[in-house]
Amino acid sequence: EILAVIVDNGAGKSTLIKALSGAVLPDEGEIRLDGKPVHFHSPIDARSAGIETVYQTLAMSPALSITDNMFMGREIRRPGVMGKWFRRLDRPAMEKFAREKLSELGLMTIQNINQAVETLSGGQRQGIAVARAAAFGSKVIILDEPTAALGVKEGRRVLELIQDVRSRGIPIILISHNMPHVFEVCDRIHIHRLGRRLTVIKPGDYSMADAVAFMTGAKLPEAAVEPA
C-alpha cells in the first residue's frame, strides 16, 4: 500500500524520517519491521534491513553519472584479485543493472545512463532517485515530498512512477503537503500533529478539508486511531 504522512510545519516530520531511516536514535518507543522490533544505529543499518529513503534534496551527486548515483555506496567490484585487492569496479555489471531497473519503471527515455545527473531535468532526477530506492528497498520506501518543486507534467510522471513501484509489491510511505496528490494515490493517510499520530484515515471516507482541519487542530477526528 501507499501510506501518506501529512504534517503541519514543525510537527516532527524530519525527526520521524530520520528515526525510521537510522539517521537519529529515538529517545523512547520502538520501530517495528514485519512485526518485529528493530534498532537502527545508522542509515546503513536501515538500508541493510530493506528500508530506502528518498529525501527532498534527493541526496544525489550532480557531477556523477546515473549509474554511479544508482550505486552510490553499493558499487559492484570485479571478481577475483582486481576487485578484492585493487578495488576495481565491475562497470559493465553496474550499467546492466541500472538499465534493467530504469527500464522496469519506464525510465529508459534517458538514452545515456553514463551522462551526468546534473544534465537531467528535475523530474528525471526524481525518477532516478525513486528507481534507486526501488532497486534496493525490499521492505519499504520512504518518499519525502517527491513532487515538490516539480512542474505539473513532471509531478504527474513521478506519481505514476510511485504507483508502478506500489504495483511491484513494495510498500511506500509518502510524506507530502500536496493534498490532491495524497488523496489521489494513497490507500491510507497518517495525520501527524504536535509530534504524535493523531489518527489514520482512508481517503474515501474524508475530504481534503477534513484532513487539513485534523492536521491543524481545527477539528478533532471522531474515529479511534487505527493500527499502523
Where are these regions (language model features)?
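Glycine-rich phosphate-binding loops of nucleotide-dependent enzymes
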Residues: 1-228
